[in-house]
Amino acid sequence: MTMQKHTLALVTEDNDKYLSLLTQRQLPDLEICGVGQSASIVLAAPPKLADSLDCYPEVQWIQSTYAGVDALLEKANTPRFQLTNVKGIFGQQISEYVLGHTINHYRHFALYKQQQTNRDWQQHHYQSLNGKRMAIFGTGAIGSHLANVVKALGIIPIGINRTGIPPRQSAFAETYHINEVNTLLTSVDIIVSTLPNTPETHGLFNGDLFAHCRGVLFFNVGRGATVDTPSLLTALEAGQIDHAFLDVFINEPISQECPYWHHSQVTVTPHIAALSFPEQVVDIFAENYLRWRDGFQLQNLVDFDKGY
């Protein structure tokens, strides 16, 4: 029996790389086509595909190369295809980002490097990570991986999600419903947001929430729209936040006039906390394609109503 052929279009930042990797895979019954109307599958970076989504009227499945798919959800008011994202590959990178900045902050490594240039021999009091309490907003794959990593260094990971129920076999010492966080925040040292942008999380980190903080380190590696910028700046001035490490923003790149650029208590990075490596994405796509081809449910399906 002849199997149905499936056509794949590539709309990524590096189509040549993806084409090479997919050609090596020789996935059965899959043909890679150019930009056009015949593609039944699209492997895409959401921002690149969003404006050309109408060019693929026959698409049945879109595999995102990102974890976040906001750009596509905004365009797909009436879902006519299945959408999957990439999961399970960003936890290590996010953990490295958060721990790297946290250790640098508490141990003053950047300050010592500056002193070195001035031949300045001066010791500074520092803090150990042991016993620090880290509130991790989002207990999915990324948050759970981060909890496992920081626990090994003596940090107490606290999970915050929509249910108050910890994931199975997780390292979270405590887990709270997102509506219960205000009293919790008075006792934490570090806040990490891995949250997606949904109606429930939009502007979640605002003045009411920050008012309960006591000189915390704040990381946003989730989505920029979860943070209210004026409230964050006010919290920094009030000492509720000691330092903010921001990797995601509502508009990227941020404008030249953005107050974050020159704020001494803000570290800005250009959305690099966790990048999608083509090799990892192709591994996920290949496994999902075989499931889809054989009639099984796709993995990492995005719920259009929830937004993730």
Which residues does each PLM region occupy?
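Phosphate-coordination loops involved in phosphoryl transfer and adenosine-cofactor binding
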Residues: Q4-K5, R80, N130-R133, G215
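Rossmann-like adenosine-cofactor binding region
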Residues: G164-P259
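Glycine-rich NAD(P)-binding loop of Rossmann-like domains
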Residues: Y112-H145, E174
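C-terminal helix-to-coil terminal segments
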Residues: T84-N85, I89-Y97, L111, E252-Y308
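Phosphate/diphosphate ligand-binding glycine-rich loop within oxidoreductases
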Residues: S40-K113
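Short loop/helix-cap segments at secondary-structure boundaries that form the rim of catalytic
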Residues: L19-T23, V35-S38, S52-Y56, A71-P79, ...
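Conserved beta-strand positions in the Rossmann-like core of class I SAM-dependent methyltransferases
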Residues: I158
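N-terminal glycine-/charge-rich "phosphate-binding" loop or analogous flexible N-terminal tail
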Residues: M1-I41
